[in-house]
Amino acid sequence: MTDSIMQNYNQLREQVINGDRRFQHKDGHLCFEGVDLDALARQYPTPFYVFSEPEIIRNIHEIQQAFAAHKNTKTFFASKTCSVMGVLKAIRDAGICAEANSQYEVRKCLEIGFRGDQIVFNGVVKKPADLEYAIANDLYLINVDSLYELEHIDAISRKLKKVANVCVRVEPNVPSATHAELVTAFHAKSGLDLEQAEETCRRILAMPYVHLRGLHMHVGDQVPESEPFAKATKVLVDESRRLEEVLGIKFDLINVGGGIPVPYKYDDENGDPLKDNMYAGITAQDFADAVIREVHKWRTDVEICIEPGRKVTGSAAVLLTEVSCEKRKTNYDLNGNVECHVEWKFVDAGYSVLSDSQHFDWFFYVYNASRMTAAHDAWIKLAGPLCDGGDYFHMGVKGEEFLLPKETHVGDIVAFLDAGAYTIESQTVYNNRPRTGVVMIDKNGDTRLIRREDSYEDMVKYDIY
């Protein structure tokens, strides 16, 4: 069993460097869009993230092509996925819009060049100041999450004498086979009950400055099958059709949210996406087909809004971290008998840098970028630098064990693949370790720093003492 796992992992490593559009190898090193990652890691302090603008563009084109059968589709990048300004700029330059979940996310999108009418505002808590900022800046949509919020929108729009364009977010009551904390359409905190949709729409229609555009939902994140998207879209379509009839209106759009998965495990023949959603299970085309099929049973002229995040940036980044310490330890049973010996490799990135590895037990392919063409044939445990017993990487190739070359030593650079979604956004400064820098590989293959590592001065400048 162990031999077959090792063989499979090394076959995948060969596929990564010889058949993946993102990766290559040179002088034994892993290259990302032609950039030698071992050499790059000597230019900047590790750990840091490396983004690929070409991969962002490819992912956006894949989504757009998937919706080619419905030309009237508008794509809003879920900026909570990664709101580094250089990444937002690449996404803006690629020609799509943005979705935000806080006033500061809205402000960042505006500052990088998105117009107000290219931004959708989501969230379960939008304070009056947030709503006033959104309405004042003429956002494309505010997705209303509660009647309480709606009353604030009404009052603020009257005060400003400005139109507030809104959708009503409803919960379609459709579960999905993803991580429990990523389900947002079944027993979730977001949205109104479907039964409240009519009352909410009637209230909006009586508000002088609030313009009702349609209904909104979001099924979940990293959903590995198309059926929940089809079911939830049908719920939204059926309710939209009914509301148009009973209210005598015509909706401008239907917003189906995001949730297109990214493959974190590539060996599809060995996994079941419904049991392990690290396998993507479906493509952007499958998502689009499920949505369009249901929408077209209602109308073909209505605008479809989508809010992908992970699908845009997930595969577009790697995390580079240096092997900074190593040791061999012995595990004993309670009677003092030797159970096994464990080879530990310590890298300078812990769960403060890559929190999903612990909080969601997320799987990432981990390779020695300095020795990428060498067989990864040694079982090791991989840990971070934090003063915390839980700061080690739990989701290995076999249980908690990872594979690296036997000759892996201190100073080697380790790469975590597919690290572009919900990673930088969730970093902390636990142990007063700095948040990482970010490097961008642009369309020409040139690299530039788009976010520097935190300095000591950054750590203390907010304290008052």
Swiss-Prot record:
Enzyme class: lyase
Family annotation (InterPro entries): Ala_racemase/Decarboxylase_C, De-COase2_C, De-COase2_N, Orn/DAP/Arg_de-COase, PLP-binding_barrel
Modified residues (N6-(pyridoxal phosphate)lysine): K80
The keyword Lyase belongs to this UniProt entry's keyword annotation: yes
Enzyme Commission number(s) from the entry: 4.1.1.116
Catalysed transformations (reactions): D-ornithine + H(+) = putrescine + CO2; D-lysine + H(+) = cadaverine + CO2
Any single biological process term in GO: lysine biosynthetic process via diaminopimelate
Active-site positions on this chain: C387
GO molecular function, one term: diaminopimelate decarboxylase activity
Keyword annotations from UniProtKB, A to Z: Decarboxylase, Lyase, Pyridoxal phosphate
UniProt-annotated binding residues for pyridoxal 5'-phosphate: G259, E307, P308, G309, R310, Y422
Pfam family, one: Orn_Arg_deC_N
pH profile of the protein: Optimum pH is 6.5-8.
PANTHER family, A to Z: DIAMINOPIMELATE DECARBOXYLASE, GROUP IV DECARBOXYLASE
Role description: Catalyzes the decarboxylation of D-ornithine and D-lysine. Ornithine is likely the physiological substrate. Has no detectable diaminopimelate decarboxylase activity in vitro.
Protein family membership: Belongs to the Orn/Lys/Arg decarboxylase class-II family.
Name of the protein this chain belongs to: D-ornithine/D-lysine decarboxylase
Organism lineage: Bacteria, Pseudomonadati, Pseudomonadota, Gammaproteobacteria, Enterobacterales
Gene: dokD
